[in-house]
A protein has these predicted regions:
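Domain-level signal for soluble alpha/beta catalytic cores
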Residues: 1-182
Length: 182
């Protein structure tokens, strides 16, 4: 059995266009890594990263443990391009930027996670073109739309719900169609 310790992106997580200081993020991640390693995890999983400043700080903190690191990237589509992002927001950084920012021999895999299902296949292709490491995916469980919809609010062009809106209308068959592309 392998026990993974999970670390998520630094606040403001839902706003990848707002960039925290590297030093603040590093302090936060060092504290989290210290707790996880003290408790005996075998692997560090970095989840929902949508900014390279967070990613660099988390990798620096996790690398000090010598444990394997899996990097999880969250992505959005905007004007036909895939960017690191969450809930319809991005800061202009790409998957290739994230892979370049992940320069540690402890990084053993990359995943696309917590991204719209209709974006995940294209994001995986970009990830595959950016790294030779193993890749994986798991998308959001909600909000699977091919076209913008207007259910309890206005949705953006990527089919994402505005912040605070529930993502509870997933059609399981449509989600499966997307997942088969992965």
């Amino acid at each position: 059995m392998v026990i993974a310790g999970s670390i998520s992106a630094f606040e403001p997580k839902g706003h990848p266009e707002i960039v925290p200081s590297y030093e603040d993020a590093l302090r936060d991640y060092e504290e989290q890594v210290k707790i996880l390693t003290r408790e005996g995890v075998d692997l560090i999983v970095l989840e929902m990263f949508a900014r390279t400043v967070d990613l660099k700080a988390a990798i620096t903190a996790a690398t000090e443990t010598s444990l394997p690191i899996w990097v999880g990237l969250s992505c959005e589509r905007h004007d036909g391009q895939i960017y690191l992002g969450l809930v319809g927001r991005h800061g202009g950084e790409t998957i290739a930027d994230a892979v370049r920012a992940s320069s540690s021999s402890n990084v053993k895999a990359f995943c696309i996670m917590h991204s719209p299902p209709q974006v995940t296949a294209d994001a995986l292709r970009e990830l595959q073109n950016s790294t030779s490491l193993p890749i994986g995916a798991y998308a959001h469980g909600g909000g699977v739309y091919d076209q913008p919809v207007n259910v309890r609010g206005v949705y953006d062009q990527g089919g994402q719900a505005p912040a605070g809106q529930p993502l509870d209308w997933t059609d399981p068959e449509r989600y499966l169609e997307y997942a088969r592309e992965w």
